[in-house]
């Protein structure tokens, strides 16, 4: 437990997509339906991260996303809300607005756009957010987007803060991740953000996985986690990791976010297209996505819309 009594994060957490209408507004019925379909197979729901397009959404749409998510989840799993922004003042303002929806955790990135290179300033940024936040804070290391990696030395200092309870690491740097794992404690959890490292991360002691794949294949990730947790034969876990790799090809179809939304569309979820300027998948890319989601060996792991027959529960 952290100093404020909050549990450290863990399990299979979904960084949720934001279904959008053609006008760029939240498609609330689709959002609520997708939440209800996925929550039974999740340990947490993370809205307004990279998969949720936070940095492109108008503030009022982001607030609606947080409000509807908390309302629809209704306490079934913890709700994580992303609040990363370009600087401290904007991050604090966003945190104030979005935590009011009733989130269980705030997920905070390093400030982006300007390159902050002083370690002390980075630490001060997160400490200021954690001091002010009414709920626990999870650090989010995603240097491919922020262009500012969180070094293990920075995370180690921040892990001592009583209101900072975990880290989502999406950098894909295994050597740094091993150092992050060494920082785990009763009050600080470490989660892997790259699904291709799921098995080795869980074997090495990671508290969970936060993967965009959980938007349509949470059962596959849960089975992989259970395989590690139950101590099943190594080959069984590796076979499940191999399935993860087969499914992950959808993220290679155009921009990864376009591939994610095209996959959900192929499964019957009308989540719309990515926010401009990211282009949607073209016809050829959509054909590859459809081939993947209709592969007999993969279909049982995928969560199709109720009116779709693209996936069948195992």
Residue ranges of predicted features:
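Secondary-structure boundary/capping signal
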Residues: 77-78, 137, 166, 188, ...
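Surface-exposed charge patches
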Residues: 96, 199, 262
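A general structural signal for well-ordered alpha-helical segments in protein cores
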Residues: 31, 62, 66, 91, ...
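C-terminal alpha-helical cap/extension of soluble enzyme domains
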Residues: 4, 8-17, 34-42, 203-206, ...
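Catalytic alpha/beta core domains of metabolic enzymes, predominantly
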Residues: 131, 143-252
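Active-site beta->alpha loop and helix N-cap motifs at the rims of alpha/beta catalytic domains
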Residues: 2-149
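Short alpha-helix boundary/capping motifs
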Residues: 66, 97, 126-127, 158, ...
